[in-house]
Design a protein with these regions (language model features):
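A solvent-exposed, acidic/Ser-Thr-rich amphipathic alpha-helical stretch
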Residues: 8-12, 16-17, 30-85, 94
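Short, cysteine-centered beta-strand-loop-beta hairpins and adjacent loop/turn segments enriched
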Residues: 98-107
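Short helix-adjacent coil turns
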Residues: 21, 25-29
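Hydrophobic/aromatic beta-strand elements that line small-molecule binding cavities or substrate pockets
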Residues: 21, 77-82, 95-97, 112-118, ...
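Basic/polar N-terminal segments that are highly enriched at the extreme N-terminus
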Residues: 1-12, 146-148
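Short beta-strand edge/turn micro-motifs at domain boundaries
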Residues: 110-140
Length: 148
């Protein structure tokens, strides 16, 4: 799907947006996190519900997630891979969070993330978010302790 010419520019623009979402997550700023999310963005997250739709739902989900932490937390994006054309792009990565929840539980978790983008009115916007963790087929439980 890569095209000649603006591919490098598109990839660098997407990379900057992903880095900005990581910074916004570390700052626990839901509005900054969703600044480049399309109004009708659809999300598949690692927690319930099965899906959510709309940037307002993303803001609400982010605020819930941020409020579940005891202070700040570490948030990193690893192995970011971007594929982009002039009007659509997607990226995937392994993301890592480390911190303490408000209930005192220590969290050191990795998950898989995919973001899909469309260029809307000359601006890259996130149109789909997918986060997942593998699960153990024998127990049916999420594999939250797995590391790359």
């Amino acid at each position: 799907m890569k095209t000649q010419g603006s591919t490098g520019t598109a990839e660098s623009e997407i990379r900057a947006l992903v880095e900005n979402t990581a910074k916004a997550s570390r700052a626990q700023d839901a509005i900054a996190l969703t600044a480049n999310y399309a109004p009708d963005v659809r999300g598949f997250d690692v927690v319930n519900p099965l899906q959510y739709t709309g940037s307002d739902a993303v803001v609400k989900r982010a605020e819930e997630w941020f409020s579940s932490w005891q202070g700040s937390f570490a948030y990193e994006i690893h192995d970011l891979s971007i594929t982009a054309s002039d009007s659509v792009a997607f990226c995937h990565s392994l993301n890592h969070v480390n911190g303490t929840k408000t209930n005192g539980q220590k969290v050191d978790m990795w998950w898989r993330a995919t973001l899909c983008f469309s260029k809307l009115n000359s601006k890259w916007m996130v149109t789909h978010i997918h986060s997942s963790v593998p699960f153990d087929m024998e127990t049916g439980k999420a594999s939250l302790d797995i590391k790359p």
